[in-house]
Curated annotation (Swiss-Prot):
Coiled coil: none annotated. One of its GO terms (biological process) is translation. Keywords: Ribonucleoprotein, Ribosomal protein. This is Large ribosomal subunit protein bL32. The keyword Ribosomal protein applies. Belongs to the bacterial ribosomal protein bL32 family. The keyword Hydrolase does not apply. Residues 1-20 are annotated as: Disordered. PANTHER family: 50S RIBOSOMAL PROTEIN L32, LARGE RIBOSOMAL SUBUNIT PROTEIN BL32.
């Protein structure tokens, strides 16, 4: 059987495991009810600045 030549730290182990999850999970988006643009869930819309029906940030110009 194969044996490890040196101890692998938890940090190195977790960095290696993170690569699999980064590649397999697709970005989840929802449609903003105010402007109809796709945005991340539970966050203010990057296009119009609305969250839960309220204006929370200024309008951002996305180039």
């Amino acid at each position: 059987m194969a044996n490890p030549k040196a101890k692998m730290s938890k940090s190195r182990r977790d960095k290696r495991r993170a690569q699999f999850n980064a590649r397999t999970k697709a970005a989840v988006t929802v449609v903003c009810p105010n402007c109809g643009e796709p945005t991340l869930p539970h966050r203010a819309c990057r296009h119009c600045g609305h969250y839960k029906g309220r204006q929370v940030t200024g309008k951002v110009v996305v180039a």
